[in-house]
């Protein structure tokens, strides 16, 4: 591991201690709390939508969230470890078979829906032990 990788690993560990980053993948619906500064006041604005892409590049990891606002598609790219992100909450888990869901850009209505992933069931050996 070179010096840059060591530095990035330390920073990721430090930033993960400040704010927990939940496990999520493309297809999941997330609510991202973004810190917005208006004059002297600071407030948290939420942005809720479907994760259509996730790029894992260490400290430079980011994810793209898409939502429909007033009939218009809005996409926003968030750096995963940005200090402007107050919180990331997974609202629901989607079942998809792709890593990038760019095809949702051309769809609207029912064709843009994503099926919900069933909850993880307990394993059979843990059931037998009970």
Curated annotation (Swiss-Prot):
PROSITE patterns: RIBOSOMAL_L19
Keywords: Ribonucleoprotein, Ribosomal protein
InterPro entries assigned to the protein according to its UniProt record, in alphabetical order: Ribosomal_bL19, Ribosomal_bL19_CS, Ribosomal_bL19_sf, Translation_prot_SH3-like_sf
UniProt cross-references to Pfam families, sorted A to Z: Ribosomal_L19
GO-annotated cellular components: cytosolic large ribosomal subunit
Organism domain of life: Bacteria
An example Gene Ontology molecular-function term: structural constituent of ribosome
GO biological process, one term: translation
Function: This protein is located at the 30S-50S ribosomal subunit interface and may play a role in the structure and function of the aminoacyl-tRNA binding site.
Annotated family: Belongs to the bacterial ribosomal protein bL19 family.
HAMAP family cross-referenced by the UniProt entry: Ribosomal_bL19
Protein's recorded name: Large ribosomal subunit protein bL19
Organism: Gluconobacter oxydans (strain 621H) (Gluconobacter suboxydans)
């Amino acid at each position: 591991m070179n010096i840059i990788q060591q530095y990035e690993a330390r920073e990721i560990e430090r930033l993960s201690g400040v704010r927990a980053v939940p496990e999520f993948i493309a297809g999941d619906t997330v609510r991202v709390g973004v810190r917005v500064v208006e004059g002297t006041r600071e407030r948290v604005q939420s942005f809720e939508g479907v994760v259509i892409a996730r790029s894992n590049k260490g400290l430079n990891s980011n994810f793209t969230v898409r939502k429909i606002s007033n009939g218009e598609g809005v996409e926003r790219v968030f750096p995963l470890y940005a200090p402007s992100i107050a919180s990331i909450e997974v609202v629901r888990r989607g079942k998809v078979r792709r890593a990038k869901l760019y095809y949702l850009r051309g769809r609207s209505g029912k064709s843009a829906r994503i099926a919900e992933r069933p909850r993880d069931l307990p394993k059979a050996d843990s059931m037998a032990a009970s």
